[in-house]
Amino acid sequence: MKKILLTNDDGYHAKGIKALEQALEEMAEIYVVAPKHEKSACSQCITITAPLRAEKIKGKEGRHYRIDDGTPSDCVYLAINELFKHVCFDLVISGINLGSNMGEDTIYSGTVAGAIEGTIQGVPSIAISQILSNKNKNTPLSFDLAQKIIQDLVQNIFTKGYPLKGRKLLNVNVPNCSLQEYQGERITPKGYRLYKKEVHKRTDPKNESYFWLGLHPLEWQKRENEDRLSDFDAIASNHASITPLNLDLTSYDDLKSLESWHEGMLK
């Protein structure tokens, strides 16, 4: 039977990871290793300056752990290299995240980081996120659509094989709409997220300042001279976006021009 490792950045008790397990439990043997507490926007952080403690969850056949103060990357690293080191995983899936991970969000995202860590460890990986309404960020319409999409995607992978080669992963974003309103999937590049750079300054009872970094509505910039619509465009039209991500961040188009710019300085 196929074996899938699940993680997230919303925490072990989050509704999204429970919905993900429910969607896949009849398709594969499911293992879950997730942070004990929410670790949203922790990016690719791993813990190297403090010990990590893994708590085995009772009644889960030894397949569930939560990691005290662990990040998604910690969870996947520990799962593959220690907790389940004798298990050969067919997939790592991170999610279902509460909120989008599109455009530059993928750099900040702990959800995407969990899938990146799976890729680094040599396992085909997927990150999946559920878009929330700007009017009510805490209540997605439901996970029904996200569950259907991940079931179909995983079944396709089991049938045809993982579609990417090398150090690459799939990033999936699911629109906040009903199954009836859903328009299907689009294969998209990342778009450009617009950040308003909000900082909220407050004063505590001791008259000391503290800050909350701003969270703002989903806004994006149109890609210029692009044949394909972006992940943002797909979501805006009630499509799911499926974006292939590459761990290699090198800007190959700029290597030659950079050499020319740097000519005379290179030895």
Curated annotation (Swiss-Prot):
Gene for this chain: surE
Cofactor: a divalent metal cation
Xref: PANTHER family: 5'-NUCLEOTIDASE SURE, 5'_3'-NUCLEOTIDASE SURE
Identification of the protein by name: 5'-nucleotidase SurE
Binding site for a divalent metal cation: 9-10, 40, 97
Keywords attached to this entry: Cytoplasm, Hydrolase, Metal-binding, Nucleotide-binding
EC number: 3.1.3.5
Family: Belongs to the SurE nucleotidase family.
Molecular function per GO: 3'-nucleotidase activity; 5'-nucleotidase activity; exopolyphosphatase activity; metal ion binding; nucleotide binding
Cited HAMAP family: SurE
Domain of life: Bacteria
Co-factor binding details: Binds 1 divalent metal cation per subunit.
Localization of this protein: Cytoplasm
Gene Ontology CC annotations of this record: cytoplasm
UniProt source species: Helicobacter pylori (strain ATCC 700392 / 26695) (Campylobacter pylori)
First-listed, main subcellular location of the protein, grouped into a coarse class: cytoplasm
Family matches, as InterPro entries: SurE, SurE-like_Pase/nucleotidase, SurE-like_sf
